[in-house]
Regions:
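Solvent-exposed edge beta-strands and adjacent loop segments
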Residues: 2-76, 128-143
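N-terminal cationic amphipathic segment used for targeting or macromolecule association
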Residues: 13-16, 115, 193
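Short beta-strand and beta-hairpin "edge-sheet" elements
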Residues: 41-42, 106-157
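Structured, beta-strand-rich domain cores
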Residues: 58-123
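Intrinsically disordered, low-complexity acidic/polar segments
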Residues: 84, 156-159
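Surface-exposed beta-strand edges and their flanking turn/coil or helix-capping segments
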Residues: 88-90, 143, 160-164
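Glycine-rich loops and low-complexity Gly/Arg-rich segments
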Residues: 99-103, 153-157, 173-176
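Intrinsically disordered, low-complexity terminal/linker regions enriched in Pro/Ser/Gly
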Residues: 161-196
Length: 196
């Protein structure tokens, strides 16, 4: 057998910060044209690319063949009253319906510009997930919600559109303001005077 040298390939770059991976949800009953929901105060997220293999011994040796996909997305967040995403998950668990879920890498190094569009495209995975044991934990600190979305079939690769304004709004709780421009706490900023 002839010796062949094909070299090596090395990836160089900055490691991806977990803060640049965002998860979005949507009810399967949401009308066409509805926005995706960003679960409030996500603290952790993760994807499991599991599955089963058929593993058999034969007279000719071992055979291993892929059998099933068992993918899941786990999310943990702090509970905020009025957060629609938690209601979507709880309702889906009650009704037996799935939830649409996107895992999006929101990093400028992987963004794709779109000609004549105000948004960029970011690498994403999409799937329909069945909620498994949504849990709301009322401890001594902040109320925490966690749940697993077991993916039906397997996650599909695609591109998720986001504008710079979307990203800025998600990354910051509020924008810069001058004195007297607004009233209200950071969670209830008002730009018009209250009616008297």
């Amino acid at each position: 057998m002839a010796e062949t040298y094909n070299g090596i390939k090395k990836t160089v770059g900055k490691a991806l910060s977990a803060k640049k991976v965002w998860y979005f949800l949507q009810s399967v009953d949401a009308p066409i044209g509805s926005p995706a929901l960003l679960p409030a105060y996500q603290t952790e997220g993760g994807v499991t690319y599991g599955g089963e293999n058929v593993d058999e011994q034969t007279k000719m040796g071992r055979i291993i063949i892929k059998s099933t996909d068992e993918q899941a997305i786990d999310l943990t967040q702090y509970f905020v009253p009025g957060d629609e995403s938690i209601e979507v998950v709880k309702d889906a668990k009650k009704t037996g319906k799935s939830v649409k879920v996107w895992r999006v890498i929101v990093d400028e190094s992987v963004a794709e510009d779109v000609t004549d569009a105000e948004y960029k495209l970011y690498p994403a995975e999409f799937g329909y997930g069945m909620p498994d044991e949504p849990e709301i934990s009322d401890g001594d600190e902040l109320v925490e919600a966690s749940y697993t979305l077991n993916i039906i079939g397997s996650l599909q690769d695609g591109k998720f559109p986001l504008t710079d304004e979307d990203i800025a709004a998600i990354e910051a709780l509020y924008d810069y303001q001058n004195p007297g421009e607004t009233t209200g706490d950071y969670s209830d900023i008002q730009t018009t005077p209250p009616a008297q």
